């Protein structure tokens, strides 16, 4: 078995041959030149695909300021730091994130993140319609997952396709 990859736009141009028996990597991963620009473009696009598998324990955690990380990991680590960065860039985004979450969970009317200077961490808080405030540490798995997806929507560092298996996981059936 062999794969043949012709050069883009050139009749009789370069052609690469890839034997597929006992191959350890994909053909796509081995192409890195402009001679195959369409394949290179597809490869570059696919490198921006993000596969998320949120771990509720990671979503609950405040983000330590010592890590310096403000990019969401596939498991959900750094969610508070991501929200803090978004708040610093455009505080109005918190209102938009709050509205988006409220569309799915009407009980919650506000989303905020604080800089807990005493503990050197960022902590997420949600406010209910009755004024009660809850830390991310006590929120349900479904609420945390929906909150993370709402935050991702307003994160300008997220590019490409988001792949998220079973988005309804942990969400009450009446919310779907």
PLM segments and residue spans:
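Electropositive, glycine-dotted interaction segments
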Residues: 1-95
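Switch/communication elements of ASCE P-loop NTPase nucleotide-binding domains
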Residues: 100, 107-176
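Broad structural signal for hydrophobic residues in well-ordered alpha-helices, predominantly aliphatic
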Residues: 42, 101-102
